[in-house]
Amino acid sequence: MPEFTNSQFPGGDGYNLGNVFIDGDNPSLSTLNPEPEWTFSVIEPLFTYTKQQLNNQTAKYHIIGHSAEAQFAHRFLFFKPEAKVDKIVASAAGWYTTLELDINFPYGLNSSPLENMDYTQLFSNHLTVLIGSNDNDPNSSSLRHNSIVDLQGLNRLERASNFYTNAQSIAVNQELNFEWNYVINPNADHNYLLAVSKAADLIFNQ
């Protein structure tokens, strides 16, 4: 993931939630930002610019995101399904935007541009949900809790499993091709280095 400074992309609205809404926790049509202002809209032009500067002919790129970066990474896939990304590893997100049409964004798809998401295209992308086997502390620092997000589970391990399983169930029920994977990193907690090492192995060696 590129670095997004807090001064330019402040807080969870500007980074984790992609600056899609002025207030991502309270979405409405009146507070929907223009798509060019979304943080998610930075990635593709950045890839093009980097290729031009390096005279690089690479057709696609990979994304590894851990914790808050994993929140950004999976939502990037949701909002930019036609991006030139090859593989995404979303590691240990604190919580997810789930594929629930009856739950409002950011916890579900309702009241957002994702309401009419194309699941066929979404599930054809290569997303790996990575989580440490010991990343199961419900009192972990900065882990969000409220009555809605706790429906996803009470810790990162539960939430990762439920997010993946729910998506897989939708794919099965609609008889869609499903290219997502769920990987548990043995004996790993919320350690960034362990997560990135495993993610790199998943992308480049498997």
Question: For the regions a protein language model found, what residue spans apply to each?
Answer:
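Serine-hydrolase catalytic machinery in alpha/beta-hydrolase-like enzymes
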Residues: 1-60
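Solvent-exposed loop/turn segments at secondary-structure junctions
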Residues: 5-9, 68-71, 94-97, 133-137, ...
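Phosphate/oxyanion-binding active-site loops and adjacent basic polyanion-contact surfaces
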Residues: 32-43, 103, 155-160, 192
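Extracellular/periplasmic catalytic domains that process cell-envelope and extracellular macromolecules
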Residues: 55-57, 80-83, 119-124, 175-176
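Short beta-strand immediately N-terminal to the catalytic nucleophile in serine-hydrolase-like folds
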Residues: 63-65
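Short glycine-enriched nucleophile-adjacent loop
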Residues: 70-81, 198-199
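The feature captures the conserved acid-bearing segment of alpha/beta-hydrolase catalytic domains
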Residues: 86-170
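C-terminal catalytic histidine-bearing segment of alpha/beta-hydrolase fold enzymes
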Residues: 164-206
